[in-house]
From Swiss-Prot:
It is an enzyme of class 3 (hydrolase). It comes from Caenorhabditis elegans. This is Dipeptidyl peptidase family member 6. Disulfide bonds join 535-658. Removes N-terminal dipeptides sequentially from polypeptides. Essential for control of distal tip cell migration. Glycans are attached at residues 108, 308, 506, 672. InterPro entries: AB_hydrolase_fold, Peptidase_S9_cat. One of its GO terms (biological process) is proteolysis. It comes from the Eukaryota. Pfam families: Peptidase_S9 (PF00326). Residues 23-740 are lumenal. Residues 1 are cytoplasmic. The active site is at 516 (charge relay system), 604 (charge relay system), 636 (charge relay system).
Length: 740
């Protein structure tokens, strides 16, 4: 009874009106994205929508406020761009409506060239059905290395493009390798291919003069990385002499070590840094002398570890300038005198600061989404819980900013650590479980338009780095192998149970949503455990693991064994097909009893349109309600602003009908999107509910109950960064003591 007046007051507060953030503010292209500094620090480049809404490249003077548009594409938005060693010359990429067959162009962005012909560009690759990639660009040579799968769609040949003369020359004809690694002089030093057991085998050219083919007799084995170590093992770069290599190595370690060794003798490795709590994230290397400057780890929030004391004063100044944020260096000039810096924060969009080392001063240079400044955004809280098999799982919770919170004195003793973190609302919330894609990826801390939108509409958001995710060690990543639709799904269920047990979520008001693997998980949730979720939104998710494996893009064939390890079976034998079928939602579509929305891009090369078509057809055959949005000009996800705003308008209306959150008025077609909308009626809902009881009885045997109120393991420190002083870096000196 003591808490009753408080709860009544909180309920009154919760029903108070909030300012709805318009979808146009959240899902239009940001004013500034892909921000980078030119090598000479004179210009800052960025991608932004032009007056017609097409994403183009702009530049802004770094010492003044003058900005100008430098590309003038009228149909396809620019995906990305890079500076080159030639002043005023950039390369940029596009694709055809999301098909991921990337095209590459060179553009002279000087004022003189644009005045002469603003649309002029040099084609490097725009062949149909060819995926071109920028492989290596050292910002010193006039040459850039380009990869093109122009002969074999599964393999990329290597070409050298001269940014001065526009000459494109074949460097290596590839018949074998999926990955190449280059030194600072753009020489091919390593290549890799999958071994028979999914291990990664690195090769080096037999001759010091390099190789022009991939014939067996021209390459010798260099390193063999076992499959269990692949998730945290990778080459980073060469030192200035090209005689030593930096790697992150996973052998003998769950989180990995940053090491350096002579290229001629990889067994003579020296450990420079041992990861403490999370995998090593970014490795910051000096642009010219190639010495190690710093490393980052990201558990809940990024933490920075400094390796070079000449770098210390700069970083300490930047950390102190905004101690509540997590500092990140976005870009550096080639002489390292000028930096672009930003800070990760969940409750404000990214601001870009220009830092000049010679005067130790940073100034606000641009705000990526200034129109959001007037709104109150959510806070994102990192925490851990234990899954039913005792595996520690990291997750994030974002609550609506208007939701009143309970103090630690108002909750049971066991919940006080969570209340201290700001995780316990006065009343349980409507909740969206937002499942990341990959699945070899992770959710991160920081501003997200998706989180800002959902929490603004009155939903809490739960993001789970379930087993199979990356960033938390190879044990967690490898624990997902073969567990699609099983333990990876159980982790999501356990996270929901945790939220309900702590009073964070109302059990009857939990929805699930995600893209790619997250879309698959949504379909799994609504077919295998529909009683847990009120509704679901699947965005480009596969429904059939058999057809997913059959239809992988050709340029993924070099990683096929890794995919087979992930999904846990192959289609080459009947036992494998049965295993995949048993975890494919398509074959259990008649179990769906809750509202479902499916969103698909017609040009998706990863998850084909057939994945969604066949699931919708199965629902239609069983008279089960579904809303299907098909975008004929999109690929693996919805990118175009008019389509994105339309998509989120549909999702918002769908969630409001399911859970009752806030909405901004919406009419289909108001954004002039390309969406083709198909809705199947509700007459089959009763039939589907009858099928559910059988499904529940079958699936319940697979669901051993775990603890529903896991203990807290780690509270993020108040500090934004941890800075460690270290000796001047030398390529063979240990920088940090290895901690046991």
């Amino acid at each position: 009874m003591l808490f009753l007046p408080i709860l009544i007051l909180n309920l009154l507060i919760i029903t108070h009106a909030i300012d709805i953030i318009p979808r146009e503010v959240l899902f239009q292209d940001p004013k500034y994205s892909s921000v980078s500094l030119s090598p000479d620090a004179k210009q800052v480049g960025y991608v932004a929508p032009d007056e017609n809404g097409i994403r183009n490249v702009f530049t802004r003077c770094s010492s003044c406020s003058y900005s100008r548009q430098v590309t003038f594409e009228t149909e396809h938005p620019i995906l990305n761009y890079v500076w080159t060693a030639i002043p005023d010359v950039i390369l940029f990429t596009q694709d055809n409506h999301g098909d991921e067959n990337t095209r590459i162009y060179k553009k002279n962005i000087s004022a003189t060239a644009i005045a002469a012909d603003k649309t002029q560009r040099v084609v490097i690759s725009e062949k149909p059905m060819v995926k071109a990639m920028i492989l290596s660009n050292n910002l010193i040579s006039e040459t850039v290395l380009i990869g093109m799968n122009d002969e074999n769609p599964a393999l990329h040949n290597i070409y050298a493009f001269n940014c001065q003369t526009d000459e494109l020359k074949l460097v290596l004809q590839n018949r074998r390798f999926s990955i190449f690694f280059f030194d600072n002089d753009l020489n091919v030093r390593l290549a890799s291919e999958e071994g028979p057991d999914g291990e990664m085998i690195y090769y080096r050219p037999r001759s010091n003069e390099g190789a022009r083919t991939t014939e067996q007799n021209t390459w010798v084995e260099y390193l063999r990385i076992q499959h269990d170590d692949k998730a945290i093992t990778m080459p980073i770069t060469f030192d200035k002499s090209n005689n030593f290599m930096y790697w992150i190595m996973g052998d003998g370690s769950d989180l990995g070590n940053l090491v350096v060794f002579p290229f001629e003798d990889p067994q003579q490795k020296e450990i420079l840094y041992t990861a403490q709590r999370a995998q090593i994230g970014n490795v910051l290397i000096h642009p010219t002398d190639k010495t190690l400057l710093a490393v980052t780890e990201v558990y809940h929030k990024p933490e920075l570890f400094v390796a070079n004391e000449t770098f210390m004063e700069d970083l300490q100044y930047l950390v102190n300038m905004k101690p509540s944020g997590s500092m990140n260096i976005v870009s550096m000039s080639i002489d390292m005198s000028t930096w672009l810096v930003t800070y990760s924060s969940s409750d404000e969009p990214y601001d870009i600061y220009l830092y000049r080392r010679w005067n130790k001063k940073a100034e606000l240079f641009m705000s990526t989404r200034p129109e959001l400044k007037k709104y109150t955004l959510n806070k994102q809280i990192g925490f851990d819980f234990r899954a039913r098999d005792e595996m520690t799982i990291q997750a994030y919770l974002s609550l609506p900013p208007q939701a009143p919170l309970l103090k630690s004195s108002q909750v049971p003793d066991g919940d006080r650590p969570y209340a201290n973190l700001g995780m316990i609302p006065a009343v349980p919330q409507k909740m969206i479980v937002l499942v990341h894609g990959g699945p070899k990826a992770r959710d991160h801390y920081g501003f997200s338009p998706m989180n800002a939108w959902l929490t603004n509409r009155g939903y809490s958001v739960l993001q789970v780095n379930f087993r199979g995710s990356t960033g938390f060690g190879k044990r967690l990543t490898n624990a997902g192998n073969g567990e699609w639709g099983r333990k990876m799904h159980f982790d999501i269920l356990d996270a929901v149970e945790f939220a309900v047990s702590k009073g964070i979520a109302n059990r009857s008001e939990v929805a699930v949503m995600g893209g790619s693997y997250g879309g698959y998980e949504t379909l799994v949730a609504l077919t295998f455990t529909p009683q847990t979720f009120a509704c679901g939104v699947d965005i480009v998710g596969p429904s059939n693991l058999i057809s997913l494996v059959q239809a992988i893009p050709p340029y993924w064939l070099g990683f096929r064994k890794d995919l087979i390890k992930m999904v846990g079976a192959d289609i080459s034998d009947e036992e494998g097909r049965q295993s995949l079928q048993s975890r494919s939602p398509l074959f259990f579509a008649d179990r769906v009893t809750k509202p479902i929305m499916i969103i698909q891009g017609a040009n998706d090369p990863r998850v084909k349109q057939a994945e969604s078509d066949q699931f919708v057809a199965a629902l239609e055959k069983k008279h089960i309600p579904v809303t299907y949005l098909l975008y004929p000009d999109e690929g693996h996800g919805v990118r175009k602003p008019q389509n994105s705003m339309e998509q989120h308008g549909h999702i918002e209306t769908f969630l409001q009908q399911c859970l009752g959150g806030e909405t901004q008025p919406f009419q289909p077609g108001q954004y002039n999107s390309s969406a083709i909308i198909k809705k199947i009626g509700i007459e089959g809902a009763a039939i589907a509910r009858q099928n559910l009881q059988i499904a529940q009885n079958q699936f319940a045997q697979q669901l051993p109950r775990g603890p529903v109120a896991p203990s807290i393991f780690y509270r993020p420190p108040v500090r934004a960064q941890r800075v460690m002083l270290a000796p001047n870096q030398n390529v063979m000196n240990r920088i940090f003591p290895v901690q046991g």
